[in-house]
């Protein structure tokens, strides 16, 4: 069953507006396979013009944890990536070192994580606007920093979680996530946050077929496994 959710803290939408594009991954204008990560300098904009980028055949190693050097794009603080398709041949999609902006970034087949955000501080915001991701067996967005992640008009299909607050980072903190106008099909929970660290999640005008779109975890620090402890209200 499809539902529109307003979850912790509760926000009741005036009108439904699930605006994630459901027409599939855009047709690429070109295809580039690179042997090394592409870095986007702090504050700069990389407009791919709807080209597809990947790291070449065999790059994906399943759920083996990688780092920024394994990514297709590495965005420094304040950088923007837009109008791009991340191909299936990659271990990590996009890494952000600090807050970043992604506009119309599509992932045709997620390997480990599509988007990893780290080193953002409380009060800093990352924006993921439009775009979407397919076939993420675990997370689409992994948030390791301490700021706010805003996900607007995104599309997710066949996924484990859309955003997830880091469950076992060495240094833990409060994190915030805001999801609006997003469509999520054939997946698990839309949002996973750590109740014990004071995380907040707001879901507004989200269309999902998940039984429990927002899930609380008891996070931990280091070599440990977070535990699911309940469901966000809404």
UniProtKB/Swiss-Prot annotation:
It is found in: Secreted. One of its GO terms (biological process) is cell wall organization. It comes from the Eukaryota. The keyword Calcium applies. It is an enzyme of class 4 (lyase). InterPro entries: Pectate_lyase_PlyH/PlyE-like (IPR004898), Pectin_lyas_fold (IPR012334), Pectin_lyase_fold/virulence (IPR011050). Pfam families: Pectate_lyase (PF03211). This is Probable pectate lyase F. It comes from Aspergillus fumigatus (strain ATCC MYA-4609 / CBS 101355 / FGSC A1100 / Af293) (Neosartorya fumigata).
């Amino acid at each position: 069953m499809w539902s529109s959710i307003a979850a912790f803290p509760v926000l009741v939408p005036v009108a439904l507006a699930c605006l994630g594009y459901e027409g599939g991954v855009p047709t690429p204008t070109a295809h580039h396979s690179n042997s090394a990560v592409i870095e986007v300098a702090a504050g700069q904009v990389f407009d791919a013009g709807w080209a597809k980028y990947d790291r070449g055949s065999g790059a994906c190693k399943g759920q083996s944890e990688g780092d920024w050097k394994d990514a297709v794009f590495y965005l420094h603080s304040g950088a923007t990536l837009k109008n791009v398709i991340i191909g299936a041949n990659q271990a990590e999609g996009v890494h952000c070192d600090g807050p970043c902006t992604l506009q119309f970034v599509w992932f045709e087949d997620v390997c480990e994580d599509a988007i990893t955000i780290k080193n953002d501080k409380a009060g800093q915001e990352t924006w993921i606007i439009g775009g979407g991701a397919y076939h993420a067996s675990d997370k689409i967005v992994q948030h390791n920093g301490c700021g706010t992640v805003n996900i607007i008009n995104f599309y997710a299909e066949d996924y484990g979680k859309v955003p997830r607050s880091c469950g076992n980072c060495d240094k833990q903190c409060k994190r915030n996530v805001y999801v609006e106008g997003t469509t999520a099909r054939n997946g698990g929970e839309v949002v996973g946050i750590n109740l014990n660290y004071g995380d907040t999640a707001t879901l507004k005008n989200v269309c999902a077929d998940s039984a429990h779109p927002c899930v609380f975890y008891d996070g931990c620090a280091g070599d440990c496994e977070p535990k699911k402890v309940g469901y966000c209200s809404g």
